[in-house]
Amino acid sequence: MHNVRVEKINEKADECRQNQNAATIEFKLEGEWRTSKDEKQFGGQLSFPNGELALDADFPSFLGGEGRAPSALAYCFFGAMSCYGSTFATQAAMANVNLKSLKISLSLSVDFRGAIGIGTFPPLKGFDFKVHVDSSASNDDIQKVKKLTDERCPAIWAMKNPVPFTTSAVKAL
């Protein structure tokens, strides 16, 4: 339904009832800072089941880059928007709510004063997702799908819950 293979989701759900790790995907990403001024500042490969994609990032000029590629945060925000939109489409299909089209927008602002050493400020002011749906379903059904999306979207979960992290830095020999 609307480019969501519900039967595959149902198969995986059945598998998860027997194996709690069946729906776990491990990610391992690598990238590199480029020191040549002729190159975009950061790059890496992103692997997915059917291939790889080369990605580059470059800060805007006021953060020391030249804006030759999206910033790292732009990728984060696109990922959050894509995750929410994809989860919405998936939840709609699972609820048998057909979508003729779905468009999503995300608005937010970032305060970079902390990043440039001016003080300690919360950098993010809030995410405003807007989903525009063309569907023959009732508004009540659309709102039920939105509620399921808010409950099940991994990006929303990550915004609501502190995610543990570790960092390390190792000097090359």
Where are the regions a protein language model picked out?
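Aromatic- and glycine-enriched beta-alpha-beta binding-site module
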Residues: 85, 89
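Extended beta-strand/beta-hairpin segments
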Residues: 1-78, 90-173
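Alpha-helical metal-binding/catalytic segments enriched in His/Glu/Asp
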Residues: 80-84
